[in-house]
Amino acid sequence: MLLNQETNVTPKFSIALVNYKTLALTKTCLTLLKQHLDDGAFDANRVQVWVVDNNSQDASTEYLRSLDWIHLIERLPEGHEEGFAAHGKALDMILEKVQDDYLFLMHTDTFVYEPEVFHELLQKCTQKTVAVGCLEQLNRGYFKTSWRLFSRFFKHYIRRGKRLLGLKAREPKPWREQYIKSFFALWDVKWMKQHGYTFFMQNRIPTYALQDILETQEKYIHTVSPMWLFKFLDHVEAGTVGLVAGYNDMNRRVKRKMAILKKIHQS
């Protein structure tokens, strides 16, 4: 467990969020975090919340400007950017600013109900662990997760076999997830800065290049199961993409978002 031996408390940490035109999601996410601060689950002097607004120019920007308890960075892109690149560059702006050793990456469609999840992940971050996170973005349950792994494993090797025989087949995709996802992940940013690493590298999805690099280092990534993690939080999964893209009311992700928001309001 990461404890200060003199004070017997968990270390200071920061939380990083990137907003782009998602007022409802961002407001819900931040409202829950503020409740945890007000309830004393976090020490406000030991937890910093950083939010980058990616040039939304809408009501979500005005909302963020109205909050005096967050560190707001308003980012102006130099030109057209892919969404993942804009997100990665925004995370790196936070990385440059934070002074704490540990940084939690969150999405604005991640809603934390049980604040002890932050301390639980910090406990799993040992001296040789650079990151802690989950390979899946939602909890499908044990049966669906097992079936998904089996079907992807079967499809992967069927395609490989066909290509070895010279038959026409698609490129086999990895049968299991390779990277922890940034909807809720803890990173040892002190170690990252010491080695000159950032979240957005090689023009790839944020943290993916870094995770590949870690395979060559004597450092590790600790993974937690979705069944365990989702006891503490919910994640819409691409909720921000759905809102910006204008998914219709019947889209499954929009349905999930509305169900989660309804549960929050009822509680």
What do the PLM-derived regions correspond to, one by one?
Residues D68-K97:
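Active-site-proximal specificity loops/subdomain of glycosyltransferases
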Residues A59, T110-Q123:
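Acidic donor-binding/catalytic loop of UDP-sugar-dependent glycosyltransferases
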Residues V117-N203:
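Conserved catalytic core of nucleotide-sugar-dependent glycosyltransferases
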Residues T22-L37:
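Short, well-formed alpha-helical segments that are part of the catalytic scaffolds
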